[in-house]
UniProtKB/Swiss-Prot annotation:
Matches recorded under HAMAP family: Pep_deformylase
Name this protein carries in UniProt: Peptide deformylase
PANTHER family documented for this protein: PEPTIDE DEFORMYLASE, PEPTIDE DEFORMYLASE 2
Alphabetically ordered keywords of this record: Hydrolase, Iron, Metal-binding, Protein biosynthesis
Residues annotated to bind Fe cation: 110, 153, 157
EC number: 3.5.1.88
Gene Ontology molecular function terms on file: metal ion binding; peptide deformylase activity
Family assignment from sequence similarity: Belongs to the polypeptide deformylase family.
Manner of cofactor binding, per the entry note: Binds 1 Fe(2+) ion.
Length: 183
């Protein structure tokens, strides 16, 4: 079971590396990593389990955040219409996105960042992603609103980008310039 002790914190170089694609079909090890990450996110949202194990609540977790430099992440979050997105994804790729941007009015947080970082994080309002789910099935999803923001936050982790790198005008010792390929 993944706990907060397994979460890599900001300042660790693995969070700044571009993660490696995983081999397909998924190995049993990669499938298990996705299942374990998804279990952590679900547990973090259960008040009893979270209190018992000292888990901070989250809606997504990327493999680099547990020290694994692979293109894997898990999400367990509900969109504005009540649709649940609960899955692990391997080799996610954005195949299209809007020019229009969106942000969470209260900013973003991160399980790897143990402090509040004020500021708006501009994200694409809509995007289409492809990848392979934790059961090995090809997926293609059109996302918008809150759930699109969650996916982009996790995708950034796979590219070595922290959410605060996107906050304009932020003076922060951990902030890095965005790479040229950033969405």
């Amino acid at each position: 079971m993944i706990t907060m002790d397994d979460i890599v914190r900001e300042g660790n170089p693995i969070l700044r590396k571009v993660a490696e694609p995983v081999e397909l079909p998924l190995t049993d090890e990669d499938k298990q990593t996705l299942v374990d990450m998804l279990e952590f996110i679900k547990n973090s949202q259960d008040p009893e389990i979270a209190e018992k194990y000292g888990l901070r609540p989250g809606v997504g977790l990327a493999a680099p955040q547990i020290g694994i430099s692979k293109r894997l992440f898990a999400i367990h979050a509900t969109d504005e219409n009540g649709n649940l997105y609960s899955m692990g994804i391997a080799n996610p790729k954005v195949v299209s996105h809007s020019v229009e941007t969106n942000e969470l009015e209260n900013g973003e947080g991160c399980l790897s960042v143990d402090r509040d970082v004020p500021g708006l994080v501009p994200r694409r309002a809509r995007l289409t992603i492809t990848g392979v789910d934790h059961e090995g099935n090809d997926v293609r999803m059109r996302l918008r609103g809150y759930i699109a923001i969650v996916f982009q936050h996790e995708l950034d982790h796979l590219d070595g980008i922290m959410f605060y790198d996107r906050i304009e005008g932020l003076e922060d010792p951990f902030k890095k310039p965005l790479p040229g390929f950033a969405l």
